[in-house]
C-alpha cells in the first residue's frame, strides 16, 4: 500500500513540469464532474516545486468577479487542498488564497471571514517525505499563521489594511478617532507580527514556491507598515490631549512601534538581497530618543510625579520617523513652594531694576532737560543764558558785521537744511539782495543768473563745503569770486564810471569795482546749457572738461578763488580756537 502511495506522488517520466500521477488523477476527476473551477484549482496547486502558473491564478481572479461563480465553492476547494499531506500542495494552496485576497473580489475575503473553518496547520508536518519536506514544513506553518491572522483581522475590522486609503489627507488611520484608533492599532500590530515571523534566508529563496510567497509578503508589509505609520502619527498628534489611560496605551503603542521598526528593517534587507528594486523599499529612520523622553515625561506629569530633565534640549523636525514635529515641549511639574520661590525672585529682580533706574535718573542733571525739551514758538525777546548749552544755538542774537573782517558773515550758519531750498526772502546770498545789472559788467550779471551746478553726495543729500553745512555751494563760490576780484586793483582800460551802489556783500564801505567784460561771443553758452567754467566746482578742486580749454584770464581767477578759500579756512580755524578757549564767550 505504501508503495502505491509513493508511486502516485512520483513525477511522471514523460512530463517536463514534474507533475505526478496524483495531480493527473485529481484533474481528471474534476473534468469528469464538469467543474472547470475545480480543475483549475488542482492545476494551480500541483506537487511541482514551482510557483502557481499565472494563467491559473488569472482565471481564478476572473472567477471572483463573475456573479454566476460560487465563492463558497471556490473557497472550500482551496481549503480542502490545504489538508493535503504534501507540503508543496499546501503551500501553493495558501499562495493561491493569498493572491485572491489581495487582487480578487472582496467577496472572497468576506466569505473566509464569515465562515468558522480554519486551516488548522499549526502542527503540520510533511508526510510524503520528499526532499526538504521537513524543513519546509516550518515555512508552511508560519505562512498559514499569517493567512489566518489576515482573515481574522478582516473579521474584526471589516476591512483589509492592505486596501485602505493611506496618506496625510484621507488616510483611514490618519483621520481615525482616538478611541477607535487605540483599539485598531493592536489588531494591525498582530498582523504585522505574524508576517515578520516568516523569516527566510537568501539561500531558501532560491526555491520557487518560497520566493513567490515572499514577494506577496513583502508587498503586504509595505502596505501594512504605511498604515501603521499613519496610525502612529495620529497617536502622537493627539497624545497631549489624551487622558492618563489613553496616554499610557499610546506610549506602549509607540514603544512597540520602535521595536517592530528593527524587525521590519531586517526583513527589507533580505528583500533587497534577492533583487527587489530599491525604489520599492522605503527608507526607515529611527526617531530620536528625546521624543520618547518627552512622551514619558508627559505621562509622569499626568500621574502626579516629577519628570526627569531631558537629555537633549533641541530636536530637529526632519529627524522624526513619523514626519511629525512637536511645537511644544512638556514642562516638568513644579511644587507650590518652588513656584512661590520663583515668584519672589522675580519680584525682587523687578524691585532692584526700578531702584537702579531711579538712581540713574537722579544722577543725570540733564535728564529732565532732555526729556522736557520741545520746540517752542519764537518770542520777540529772549534772555540769554550762558550756562544753557542746548538753547544757545536755537535763536542766535544778530551780530553786527565787522567791516575789517571780510569773512564775518560766513560764521553765521543758515537755518535751512542743505537739501531744502531757502525761501524767496533769502534767495540772495546771506540776505543781501543783488544790485541792479550794470551795463559795464554783463558777465557779472550772467554769473548770478547762471543755473547752479548741484553736486549730490553719495547718500542723496546736497553736498556742502566743509565747515558750512547750511550754505549753498554756488552762492559761496560766487561770493568768493566777487571778493577776490574786487580786492584787486582795476587794470587799465576798465570802465570805472559806475554807480555808487556796491555789489560786494562782504564790505559795506569798499568802493564798487566793475567786473571784467569778456567777449560774450567767444565764451557765451547757448540758452539752457551748462557754463564752460563754474567757480563753484573750482572751489572744490574738481576739474571740468566740456571739450574746450579754460582761458588764461579765468585760470588767474581760479587761483584767486583758491587763495580766498584758504584765507577763509584759516580765519574759521582761528575763530574755533578762540571759542574753545572761552566756552562762555567772555
Swiss-Prot record:
Location within or outside the cell: Membrane, Clathrin-coated pit; Golgi apparatus; Cytoplasmic vesicle, Clathrin-coated vesicle
Main subcellular location: membrane
BP GO terms, sorted: clathrin coat assembly; clathrin-dependent endocytosis; locomotion; necroptotic process; post-embryonic development; protein localization to postsynaptic membrane; receptor-mediated endocytosis; regulation of receptor localization to synapse
A GO term from the CC aspect: clathrin-coated vesicle
Domain ENTH: 29-161
Chain spans, region Disordered: 450-474
Single GO term (MF): clathrin heavy chain binding
PROSITE patterns given in the database record: ENTH
SMART domains given in the database record: ENTH
Keywords from the UniProt entry: Coated pit, Cytoplasmic vesicle, Endocytosis, Golgi apparatus, Membrane
Tissue: High levels in the nervous system and at lower levels in other tissues. In neurons, enriched at presynaptic terminals and is also present in cell bodies.
Residues passing through the membrane, by range: none
Similarity field: Belongs to the PICALM/SNAP91 family.
Complex formation: Binds clathrin and phosphatidylinositol 4,5-bisphosphate.
Function: Assembly protein recruiting clathrin and adaptor protein complex 2 (AP2) to cell membranes at sites of coated-pit formation and clathrin-vesicle assembly. May be required to determine the amount of membrane to be recycled, possibly by regulating the size of the clathrin cage. Involved in AP2-dependent clathrin-mediated endocytosis at the neuromuscular junction. Required for the efficient targeting of the synaptic vesicle protein synaptobrevin.
Protein name per Swiss-Prot or TrEMBL: Phosphatidylinositol-binding clathrin assembly protein unc-11
Organism annotation: Caenorhabditis elegans
Organismal lineage: Eukaryota, Metazoa, Ecdysozoa, Nematoda, Chromadorea
Gene name of the record: unc-11
Amino acid at each position: 500500500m505504501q508503495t502505491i502511495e509513493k508511486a502516485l506522488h512520483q513525477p511522471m517520466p514523460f512530463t517536463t513540469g514534474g507533475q505526478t500521477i496524483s495531480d493527473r488523477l485529481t484533474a481528471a476527476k474534476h473534468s469528469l464532474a464538469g467543474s472547470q473551477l475545480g480543475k483549475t484549482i488542482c492545476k494551480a496547486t500541483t506537487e511541482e516545486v514551482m510557483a502557481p502558473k499565472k494563467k491559473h491564478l488569472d482565471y481564478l481572479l476572473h472567477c471572483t468577479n463573475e456573479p454566476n461563480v460560487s465563492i463558497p465553492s471556490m473557497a472550500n476547494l482551496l481549503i480542502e487542498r490545504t489538508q493535503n499531506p504534501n507540503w508543496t500542495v499546501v503551500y501553493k494552496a495558501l499562495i493561491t488564497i493569498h493572491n485572491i485576497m489581495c487582487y480578487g473580489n472582496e467577496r472572497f475575503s468576506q466569505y473566509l471571514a464569515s465562515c468558522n473553518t480554519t486551516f488548522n496547520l499549526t502542527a503540520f508536518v510533511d508526510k510524503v517525505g520528499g526532499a526538504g519536506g521537513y524543513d519546509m514544513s516550518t515555512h508552511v506553518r508560519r505562512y498559514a499563521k499569517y493567512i489566518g491572522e489576515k482573515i481574522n483581522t478582516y473579521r474584526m475590522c471589516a476591512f483589509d489594511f492592505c486596501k485602505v486609503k493611506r496618506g496625510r489627507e484621507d488616510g483611514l488611520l490618519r483621520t481615525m478617532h482616538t478611541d477607535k484608533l487605540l483599539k485598531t492599532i493592536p489588531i494591525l500590530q498582530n498582523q504585522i507580527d505574524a508576517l515578520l515571523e516568516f523569516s527566510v534566508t537568501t539561500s531558501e529563496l532560491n526555491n520557487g514556491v518560497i520566493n513567490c510567497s515572499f514577494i506577496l509578503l513583502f508587498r503586504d508589509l509595505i502596505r501594512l507598515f504605511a498604515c501603521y505609520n499613519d496610525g502612529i502619527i495620529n497617536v502622537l498628534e493627539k497624545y497631549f490631549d489624551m487622558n492618563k489611560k489613553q496616554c499610557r496605551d499610546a506610549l506602549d503603542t509607540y514603544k512597540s512601534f520602535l521595536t517592530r521598526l528593527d524587525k521590519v528593517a531586517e526583513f527589507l534587507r533580505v528583500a533587497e538581497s534577492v533583487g527587489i528594486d530599491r525604489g520599492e523599499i522605503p527608507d526607515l529612520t529611527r526617531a530620536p530618543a528625546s521624543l520618547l523622553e518627552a512622551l514619558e515625561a508627559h505621562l509622569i506629569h499626568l500621574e502626579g510625579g516629577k519628570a526627569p530633565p531631558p537629555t537633549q534640549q533641541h530636536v530637529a523636525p526632519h529627524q522624526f520617523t513619523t514626519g511629525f514635529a512637536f511645537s511644544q515641549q512638556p514642562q516638568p511639574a513644579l511644587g507650590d513652594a518652588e513656584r512661590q520661590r520663583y515668584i519672589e525672585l522675580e519680584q525682587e529682580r523687578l524691585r532692584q531694576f526700578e531702584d537702579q533706574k531711579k538712581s540713574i535718573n537722579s544722577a543725570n542733571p540733564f535728564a529732565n532737560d532732555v526729556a522736557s525739551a520741545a520746540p517752542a514758538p519764537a518770542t520777540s525777546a529772549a534772555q540769554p543764558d550762558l550756562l544753557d548749552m542746548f538753547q544757545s544755538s536755537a535763536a542766535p542774537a544778530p551780530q553786527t558785521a565787522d567791516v575789517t573782517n571780510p569773512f564775518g558773515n560766513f560764521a553765521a550758519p543758515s537755518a535751512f537744511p542743505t537739501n531744502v531750498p531757502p525761501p524767496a526772502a533769502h534767495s540772495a546770498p546771506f540776505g543781501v539782495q543783488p544790485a541792479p545789472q550794470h551795463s559795464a559788467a554783463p558777465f557779472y550779471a550772467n554769473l548770478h543768473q547762471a543755473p547752479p551746478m548741484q553736486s549730490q553726495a553719495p547718500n542723496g543729500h546736497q553736498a556742502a563745503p566743509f565747515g558750512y553745512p547750511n550754505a549753498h555751494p554756488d552762492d559761496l563760490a560766487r561770493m568768493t569770486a566777487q571778493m577776490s576780484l574786487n580786492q584787486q586793483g582795476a587794470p587799465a582800460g576798465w570802465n570805472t564810471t559806475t554807480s555808487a551802489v556796491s555789489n560786494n556783500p562782504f564790505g559795506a564801505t569798499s568802493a564798487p569795482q566793475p567786473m571784467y567784460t569778456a567777449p560774450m561771443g567767444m565764451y557765451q553758452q547757448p540758452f539752457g546749457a551748462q557754463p564752460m567754467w563754474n567757480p563753484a566746482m573750482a572751489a572744490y578742486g574738481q576739474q571740468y572738461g566740456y571739450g574746450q580749454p579754460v582761458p588764461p584770464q579765468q585760470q588767474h581767477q581760479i587761483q584767486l578763488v583758491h587763495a580766498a578759500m584758504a584765507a577763509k579756512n584759516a580765519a574759521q580755524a582761528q575763530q574755533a580756537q578762540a571759542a574753545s578757549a572761552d566756552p562762555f564767550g567772555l
